[in-house]
Amino acid sequence: FLQTGFSAHGSAFDEMHEVIANSTRYLTAEDMTALSTFLLGDNPPAPQPLPAAVSPDSGTGNGAGTLDAGRGHYMALCASCHGSEGLGRSLTMPPLKGNSTVRQADARNLVLAILVGLPKHPATQQGPTPLPGMPGFMQELTDGEVAALANYTRTALGGQPADVTAAQVADLRSAAGKSGHKAAP
């Protein structure tokens, strides 16, 4: 991940993308091992199993109708790259099923990825195929539509509750515009 910005669990976003593009992708194998050992320790934690999908009524009252709308947005905007089941495409598009961003209890990074997109990942020696960026949908989707898409993705692919609200999306949309979060080119 630290050399390519891409793993089975997700892809680098925002500041981490810059760290990889401008720094860690140039590390030698020895330096990468040392850095990984420093970050994870000598005995890194075992991977955690993916939680089961939660029911549409979990969370803050976003019911099945909202999740159906979110599924519609997912199929229209996301499935062509990430697949209808969220499995991605090997080495070119990350899976969303089990993706660490989708599995986080705090949906902030997922909502920001939907709003502003993700940058391209350049080719590296370890990952010679450059990966395309993900477009942001800040201009195309309302706050309610982003919340519905995030909630569908979280429940169906990440085992998280449907607890993203339009008000939370509005706050993140405003903050993204002020903070310098960059839309994908």
Language-model segments: which ranges?
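Short acidic alpha-helical/loop segments enriched in Asp/Glu that coordinate divalent cations
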Residues: 49-53, 84-94, 126
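Extended, polar beta-sheet/loop recognition surfaces of beta-rich domains
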Residues: 2-6, 97-148
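Flexible coil segments in periplasmic/lumen-exposed cytochrome c-class electron-transfer proteins
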Residues: 8-77, 124-185
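Sparse, context-dependent recognition of short Cys/His-centered cofactor- or disulfide-binding micro-motifs
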Residues: 1, 12, 81, 95, ...
